[in-house]
């Protein structure tokens, strides 16, 4: 597909072949190379391509991922293995900074998400303090064996006071696994997601990524 302008350079760099040259030669019928099974080769790197979202440039937009195309670009990341490549991609697209142990994580969203309990347990065992703004989420988290969470005051209409709350509890990143897009701008999941972006905090809202 010659229209895949971003995929062509990505695949060319990953596999070490300039496919634009190959395609051009094939079109004009000159110096067409013999077919080669590039996937049979061994490479010393792994590469992935991830979407780039522009939530910081869209004031008030809900940083919610749905089926529609919401990305405004892509980033290619390389690493020695899949995990290194993925870490590089997260850092380059979201400004993700690894939160420090014993700092706060704000959890919210759909507690029926299968991964929710696993995520909360791992974070707690790593030494993070778990916070939430919803009583149902609080009850769910505190019902997980050997996990403790605290529900905090969460001003929905006052960004300055909300910033103070984030600072007081040393909340360093937000995980919000909401199932549906927020119906309005006073929805607590929307407020958590939007202000994570506005405060420059890492936001994760996809279960597998979390």
Where would I find each of the regions flagged by the language model?
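ATP-dependent carboxylate activation and anion-phosphoryl transfer catalytic cores
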Residues: 1-100, 110
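Buried hydrophobic positions in well-ordered alpha/beta secondary-structure cores of metabolic enzymes
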Residues: 23, 85, 140-141, 206
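General beta-strand structural signal in soluble alpha/beta enzymes
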Residues: 78, 107, 130-134, 151, ...
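A general structural motif
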Residues: 82-88, 109-112, 153-163
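Glycine-rich phosphate/diphosphate-binding loops that line cofactor/substrate pockets in enzymes
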Residues: 91-104, 123, 164-171
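Short internal beta-strands
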Residues: 127-136, 140-141
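Short hydrophobic/aromatic-enriched beta-strand-loop microsegments
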Residues: 127-130, 145-157
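Peripheral docking tails and interdomain loops at the edges
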Residues: 153-210
């Amino acid at each position: 597909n010659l229209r895949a302008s971003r995929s062509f350079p990505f695949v060319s760099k990953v596999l070490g072949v300039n496919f634009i040259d190959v395609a051009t030669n094939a079109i004009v019928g000159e110096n067409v190379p013999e077919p080669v099974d590039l996937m049979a080769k061994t490479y010393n790197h792994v590469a992935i391509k991830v979407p780039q979202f522009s939530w910081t440039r869209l004031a008030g937009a809900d940083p919610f991922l749905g089926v529609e195309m919401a990305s405004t670009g892509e980033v290619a990341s390389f690493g020695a293995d899949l995990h290194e490549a993925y870490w590089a991609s997260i850092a380059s697209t979201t400004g993700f900074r690894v939160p420090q142990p014993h700092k706060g994580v704000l959890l919210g969203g759909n507690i029926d998400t299968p991964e929710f309990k696993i995520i909360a347990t791992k974070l707690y065992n790593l030494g993070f303090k778990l916070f939430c703004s919803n009583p149902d989420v609080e009850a769910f988290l505190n019902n997980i064996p050997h996990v403790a969470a605290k529900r905090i005051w969460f001003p929905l209409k006052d960004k300055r006071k909300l910033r103070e709350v984030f600072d007081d509890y040393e909340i360093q990143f937000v995980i919000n696994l909401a199932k549906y897009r927020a119906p309005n701008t006073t929805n607590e999941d929307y407020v958590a997601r939007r202000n994570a972006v506005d405060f420059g905090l890492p936001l994760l809202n996809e279960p597998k990524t979390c």
